[in-house]
Amino acid sequence: RHAGSAHTF
């Protein structure tokens, strides 16, 4: 889960 990702894992 990264705040810059388009798809959060």
From Swiss-Prot:
Cofactor comment text: Binds 2 magnesium ions per subunit.
Keywords, sorted A to Z: Carbohydrate metabolism, Cytoplasm, Isomerase, Magnesium, Metal-binding, Xylose metabolism
Annotated GO biological process: D-xylose metabolic process
Single GO molecular function: metal ion binding
Names of the cofactor(s): Mg(2+)
GO cellular component: cytoplasm
Localization terms from the record: Cytoplasm
Organism domain of life: Bacteria
Subunit structure: Homotetramer.
Function (record text): Involved in D-xylose catabolism.
Name the record gives this protein: Xylose isomerase
Annotated source species: Streptomyces sp. (strain NCL 82-5-1)
Gene: xylA
